[in-house]
Design a protein with these regions (language model features):
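Alpha/beta-hydrolase superfamily serine-hydrolase fold, recognizing
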Residues: 1-153
Length: 153
């Protein structure tokens, strides 16, 4: 998400864009499934719920909570330090126990308030990373992605 919101921030660009000098890594659209939209809020949730499978990787990836806040797409929106708001589709299982659903709800509300276009599709009874398995929900997710691409490419 940070690469979408802050495509030219050197902290989130590892590889240079090849081609013409005036090319950028700005994205024309984003499709994301069960994203980490607020790393710090997710970490606090995981600590409160004692979910070690989320706590340990967060602490390994981020040096401290300040870095979690800095690396949070939600907080980037709140701070206003984003560069662009590409059209976005979020696929989210409503039984994802990695986050409370208030996190994507808040992100969508803020994204729209800032002028961005975002659609969120909830999948009843589906857990985190649900679309990695074949089934009706995955079929629905693929259909939504196709529709989104047809409208945005």
């Amino acid at each position: 998400m940070l690469s979408a919101l802050r495509y030219d921030d050197p902290r989130y660009t590892v590889n240079p864009v090849s081609g013409e000098e005036d090319q950028t890594a700005e994205l024309g659209y984003v499709i994301t499934g069960w994203p980490v939209l607020d790393a710090h809020a997710r970490y606090l949730y995981a600590r409160k719920a004692d979910i070690s499978r989320l706590i340990k990787p967060s602490e390994a990836y981020f040096p401290d909570e300040a870095a979690m806040q800095e690396g949070s797409p939600q907080q980037s929106l709140d701070r206003g330090d984003y560069r662009t708001l590409p059209p976005m589709l979020i696929l989210q299982g409503d039984s994802d126990d990695n986050i409370p659903l208030t996190i994507p709800e808040r992100f969508v509300e803020t994204y729209r308030d800032k002028g961005g276009s975002v659609d969120i599709a909830y999948f009843p009874g589906m857990p985190h990373a649900f679309a990695q398995q074949a089934g009706p929900s995955t079929d629905r997710a693929i259909g939504l992605m196709k529709e989104f691409l047809a409208q945005n490419v």
